[in-house]
Amino acid sequence: MKILVTGFDPFGGDKINPAIEAVKRLPDEINGAEIIKLEIPTVFNKSAEVVKEAIEKENPDYVLNVGQAGGRFGLTPERVAININDGRIPDNEGYQPLGEPIHEDGETAYFTQLPIKAEAKAIRDAGLPASISNTAGTYVCNHIMYQVQYMRDKEFPNIKAGFIHIPFLPEQVVNRPNTPSMALDDIVKGLTAALGAIVERDGKGDIKAVEGANH
């Protein structure tokens, strides 16, 4: 089994992005699965081109995109990606779409194929906070999650794909009072646990567990 794991470069004025820093530190193998690590740009459209090239080269069984969600307390596997680009800030090349569809011929939304409840449980079993998220936002994180699902729908039907958001690092919140953060080693630990759950649930589907939200 082969899992492609991607992490974004820094954006929005930060000099570091915990996504790529954590991805770079993942083991090369988890529960027998080969882990392929890839840095991608925080740029609409170009990020998808980079991931597509890697899918064509590596032919992975799974794709897990990792992104920073500043303000969240724990690791949050994402349930769904929506067909909208709506940038709160410009991307790293200055592009700021305001409410535009990602693909005119794409579905309104795509659900992940990953066992997100098993991922969340595995992260918590590792001693770290985790919960299911039902919105990946409308920036490049949602964009890449949607783009990979679109690729799966149109070109790569055998892959399973999803996204997980991670918190800020402590050094990112020095001037952001009352903002949660997580140590890089813990983020790596949580991602490793999530990837282990993906491998363990291969061919079995997700677990049954209470992970719903009221709002």
From Swiss-Prot:
Active site, renumbered: 78, 141, 165
Classification via PROSITE patterns: PYRASE_CYS, PYRASE_GLU
InterPro entries according to UniProt: Peptidase_C15, Peptidase_C15-like, Peptidase_C15-like_sf, PGP-I_bact-type, PGPEP1_Cys_AS, PGPEP1_Glu_AS
CDD domains the record matches: Peptidase_C15 (cd00501)
Catalytic activity, reaction form: Release of an N-terminal pyroglutamyl group from a polypeptide, the second amino acid generally not being Pro
Annotated EC: 3.4.19.3
Compartments where located: Cytoplasm
GO CC annotations on file: cytosol
Signal peptide positions (record): none
Gene3D superfamilies attached to this UniProt entry: Peptidase C15, pyroglutamyl peptidase I-like
GO MF annotations in UniProt: pyroglutamyl-peptidase activity
Parts forming coiled coils: none
PANTHER family: PROTEASE FAMILY C15 PYROGLUTAMYL-PEPTIDASE I-RELATED, PYROGLUTAMYL-PEPTIDASE I
Job of this protein: Removes 5-oxoproline from various penultimate amino acid residues except L-proline.
Similarity comment text for this entry: Belongs to the peptidase C15 family.
Subunit structure comment from the entry: Homotetramer.
Official protein name in the record: Pyrrolidone-carboxylate peptidase
